[in-house]
Amino acid sequence: HDRFGINGIVAGYIGALRKPILEEILEAASKVNALSVLIVGGAPKGQAGYTNMIKELEELAVEKGANAKFTGPLPYSMMNECYAACDILMVGHYVDKRLRDYAIPKKLLDAMAYKVPVIVGPYDARMKIVERYECGIVTEDWAKALTKLSNNKTLRKKMGENGYKAFKMNYTWEAQEQKLLQVYSD
C-alpha cells in the first residue's frame, strides 16, 4: 500500500481506463467505508482525451467522496506491485457487448495468480471461472460486493487462495503445455 500512498482495504482496477465503468466503480466505492481504490492504466489504444478524462474522474471521486488514486499507465514490470497492493480486484466489462460473454480478461487470471479475490460482472466465461473456483463474486452490484469483501478478511483470503490453487492447476504455461500435448497425442 505504501508504494502507491494508499491505505485501508484496497480495491484495484487495472487496465484500459473506460469512463463508464470507472464512473460505476467510483460511485460504488464511495458507499464503502475505509476503502481505497487504486486505478492503474491509461487510455484505450488509439483514444485521445485521456488527460481530460482523468481530471473528470478525479473530480467525480472527490465529489462522491471516493478515496481514489490514479497512477496513469505503468510499465508491465510494475504489475506485480500493483496486484500485491490490492486486497480486491474489480474486473470491468468490455465495451463491445459481443465480447462480454466469451472473453476471459488476463487480469482475472493475474488476480488469481496473486491470490487476489475478484469482482466480475455476470458474463459467461468469467462467471464460470469465478463460480467454479469460488475465487470472487459475480455481480452487477459493485457496492454490495465491495462491502462484503472489504468487511470480511477471512473470505478475501479464502477466495484468494482458491483462485491461486485453480491458477496453478489450470492456467500456468506448464498446465497449458500438458493440455496441448494431450490434444496432439490423441
Regions from the language model: what does each represent?
Residues I39, G92, V120, V138-T139:
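Hydrophobic residues in well-ordered beta-strands that form the structural core
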Residues R132-D141, K148-K153:
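Conserved acidic donor-binding segment of nucleotide-sugar-dependent glycosyltransferases
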Residues G5-P20, L26-K31, V37-V40:
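Conserved donor-binding/catalytic core segment of Leloir-type glycosyltransferases
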Residues R18-P20, P75-E81, L89-L109, V120-K128:
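Nucleotide-sugar-dependent
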